[in-house]
Amino acid sequence: MDPCECAKTGACNCGATCKCTNCQCTTCKKSCCSCCPSGCSKCASGCVCKGNSCGTSCCQ
């Protein structure tokens, strides 16, 4: 069972607290998430989520 309902609801959970919205993925992939550490306005395209944040190298 796919825990990601992206195709149906456009939202999924990657990791414990990272929730991505406007998700177009058909399966739950961490790279689909756009969760960022506090202070980051956004993550670079294709950023891989690590828990509920991404590395500083992902931030733009």
Swiss-Prot record:
Annotated TM spans: none
Protein name: Metallothionein-1
Family, per entry: Belongs to the metallothionein superfamily. Type 1 family.
Segments for region (Beta): 1-28
GO molecular function list: metal ion binding
Domain of life per record: Eukaryota
Cited Pfam families: Metallothio (PF00131)
Binding site for a divalent metal cation 5: 33, 35-36, 49
Keyword field contains Ligase: no
Chain sites annotated for binding a divalent metal cation 2: 6, 12, 14, 25
Binding-site residues, a divalent metal cation 6: 36, 40, 43, 59
Binding site for a divalent metal cation 7: 49, 54, 58-59
Originating gene: mt
